[in-house]
Amino acid sequence: MASLKDLRNRIASVKATQKITKAMQMVAAAKLRRAQMAAEAARPYAERMDTVLGNLAAGIVGAGQAPVLIAGTGQSQKHLLLVCTGERGLCGAFNTSIVRLAREKAQQLIGEGKDVTFFCVGRKGYDQLRRTYPDRIIELVDLRSVRTLSFKNASDIASKILTLLDQGAFDVCTLFYSNFKSVISQIPTAQQIIPAVFEAQDEGEGGPVYEYEPAEEDILADLLPRNIAVQIFRALLENQASFYGSQMSAMDNATRNAGDMIKKQTLIYNRTRQAMITKELIEIISGAEAL
């Protein structure tokens, strides 16, 4: 049985941990609102760009003049998995769920005889993937020094991706991130960004007819590389909101668990102390009777 001193130290230790988890929960809650607003603000722009590019691509593909970012390289042997995770832990299953989805995709592709490589954004995803695929990781982007995410961060990543495409490093690129729904719901998502996949547009009778100036080919040549950066930026913002939501939930659970443990240890402490007092009283009474 633990001594009273051990129990007091244990209770004090759990209380100190509870203060830390409570503080982290409050910080995550404060940052979540700003991150959620940024993620929600980026969605309409990214979705609208997809719509515009889908309309443009429909005419170009039909004419057989589609650029490589839409038509692809003509092969699907080499796959690049762009895995975006967080730089820190203590956030529940946020990082693990994204990496799990990427691993499942990698195992499927390798089983089909495809060549798979990883482009990691975030230290936590890199640390997990290098245990299983140490020789398949070709790039790591560390964002720990970035205080506020900007479009330039995504643009720099997109430039590296496009350079790898020009070098023939891959044929298909799939982006992995966590789609923020709510504090308790973040959905791991896989999105193919090269070649781009656009949702089919419903062209009913009487629908709008678009005319583009300059030519569609010139617009696509400018917008398609930017769209890669836009989709990556959106994924980074969704990840940021998902991280804080998951961290807030995880720290709330940790704080509650610490409270339960404090109650349990306090009960054990009181029972142990009561038993020791009772034992001492019995010894005193027994000694008095012996006299």
UniProtKB/Swiss-Prot annotation:
Which segments cross the bilayer? none
* Membrane topology of this protein: Peripheral membrane protein
Q: What family classification does the UniProt entry report for this protein? A: Belongs to the ATPase gamma chain family.
Matches recorded under InterPro entries: ATP_synth_F1_ATPase_gsu, ATP_synth_F1_gsu, ATP_synth_F1_gsu_CS
Whose protein is this, by species?
Xanthobacter autotrophicus (strain ATCC BAA-1158 / Py2)
Fetch the NCBIfam families from UniProt.
ATPsyn_F1gamma, PRK05621.1-4
Q: Name one GO molecular function term.
A: ATP binding
Major place of residence:
membrane
Where is this protein localized, as stated in its record?
Answer: Cell inner membrane
Protein's job = Produces ATP from ADP in the presence of a proton gradient across the membrane. The gamma chain is believed to be important in regulating ATPase activity and the flow of protons through the CF(0) complex.
Output the lineage of the source organism.
Bacteria, Pseudomonadati, Pseudomonadota, Alphaproteobacteria, Hyphomicrobiales
Keyword set includes Manganese: no
Kindly provide the name given to this protein in its UniProt entry. Answer: ATP synthase gamma chain
From the record, give the cysteines joined by S-S bonds. none
State the source organism's domain of life.
Bacteria
